[in-house]
Amino acid sequence: MKRFHSSLLFLLLSSFVVAETPPNIVLLYSDDAGFADFGFQPNCRPDVKSLTPRISSLASAGARLTNGYMSGCVCSPSRAGMMTGRYQERFGYDNNLPPGTKDGLPLEETFGVKRLQKLGYETALIGKWHLGYPEAFHPNKRGFDWFYGLLQGSRPYFPMPKPTPHRVIQENGKATEEIGYVTDRLGDAACRFIRENKDGPFFLFLSFTAPHGPLQPKEVDARKLSSIEQKRRRNYAGLLVSLDANVGKVLDTLKSEGLDENTLVIFTNDNGGQTQLGANNFPLKGKKGSLHEGGVRVPWALRWPGKIKPGTVIDDPVIALDLMPTFIEMAGGKVEESWKLDGVSLLESWQKGKPLAERPLYWRKAGSSGDRAMRLGKWKLFHGRKENTPPALYDLSKDVAEEKDLSASNSEQLKTMLKMLDQWESELTEPRWGPGKG
């Protein structure tokens, strides 16, 4: 598959291994947003096309990735994969972490952010954690110097009278006052972190809860959207407006502090859009919780001034497992074989425009009796074991909506991929909690 449309990537004069000033890294996550709900996406729905100009500016000033994936189809597992660079099913993290569970991402697993700390980076997580509730699993214990956010997967956007310890916005373990709109609070905290660490280098993971439910937009945002007739879609869109405004705050702060030229900014979403709450994943099949494309393929945009030319389109399949290896190499570190990462560094590919070698991407949910899927080049295999349906094979280069099963006419391709998928699954453990628990 051709990776870059024309010669769109600037060559670097030197690598970051010897750079005097390592780049800052800002990773922006939305939550449960739709594949077709951001203006930079070619299939963005008309009703929200103009609502995300600041997020879309990242793609126009940098790159849009057409085949960007998460390693999980729901919130918590996808974060577990990204944070470690390893398929989360290797350590039993198939399912969302239930509220109050006395468990989390196994302590034996190393977060990539801890490795960034060792390379001299100041690190922050602002927003949603969802990777463990007991003290041993706290973000401050897993590699984040500063944590400002909530431990649980969601909460109301407006102040709560008596928030539980897992839903209150805390700062390094201490509850903060319930005041203000959550998306604004997270955006303001991110700007504060940038200003206080402008001498860098820093890694900021801004993990918004928007537009995850509950659908509680600010009234001022909802009033702008009267043209959207369906109330659910209108309220969802209101959450996008606030999300975009706060991404804008972050971009403005980087610029005002003189940091934008030496900062990589990546925007993506944690899993497929939740259509039941207003998201739109057109033209993909499926939604959050599904291993069809609509559950795991997500919007990706990135800006890296002087390194990636404005308007670049990257077609190579990439997955969030690749982020931490990439960041470590950007920081001047070396990815060790002993870490047994599944993700690969994208740095050389981004720097030199080299296509990535073809590799399989895998998914599983709910253990060895749940659904599983795989992508290899243009081929997508989906095996719906939960409904006891036979494996299906799709050609994504012609059928991104997964409508035409080609398994009967491509039996050898199906056989090869099933063998690879079986081998991968033999290396996994059963879920630690939830459906399929071992």
List each language-model region with its residue ranges.
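Formylglycine-dependent sulfatase
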Residues: 4, 16-392, 396-438
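Bacterial N-terminal signal peptides
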Residues: 7-15
